[in-house]
Amino acid sequence: MRWPMQNRTTAVIAVALATTALVACSSRSASAVSSTATVTVDGKDSTMHIVKCTQLEWYRMINIGSDFAGAKIVIDQRAHPVTAESVRIQNLNGFTGMYSRGGDGNADLRLSGDKFTITGTAHGYKADKPGDAATATFKIVTAC
């Protein structure tokens, strides 16, 4: 009667190892919450206390602030050097706009350990003149 118990134990261990392997190989990863980020738009700083970092294969998504006011960044970590694919600024210091690689604007990304610094220009509009095109400079500093 010892053999059936050993078979059950072996089966449980095998299932646990298989589950661990599947989770480790999954393309989805857990989100990490960073403490703060500083987003500067046209020289005016905003300190944001909600920063969510998500890794999906070679892409890192950084969500700063909220849907109402904040920034969303997509970083391509496959590229050498690592590059910002897009930066979306939403209602910060009266500006809403974006940079997208291959489109208008520019972005320079510097990585030091887990600290990202992204600087550049984005195209969009200002809250006081939403019908007029506007360009703004930005600098985003955060850790993920």
Swiss-Prot record:
Protein location: Cell membrane
Keyword Lipoprotein carried by entry: yes
Protein name, entry field: Putative lipoprotein MAH_0816
Entry's family note: Belongs to the mycobacterial 19 kDa antigen family.
Transmembrane segments: none
Lipidation feature positions (N-palmitoyl cysteine): C25
Lipidation, S-diacylglycerol cysteine type: C25
Record membrane topology: Lipid-anchor
GO cellular component, one term: plasma membrane
Signal sequence segment: 1-24
Keyword terms, alphabetized: Cell membrane, Lipoprotein, Membrane, Palmitate, Signal
Pfam annotation, one family: Myco_19_kDa
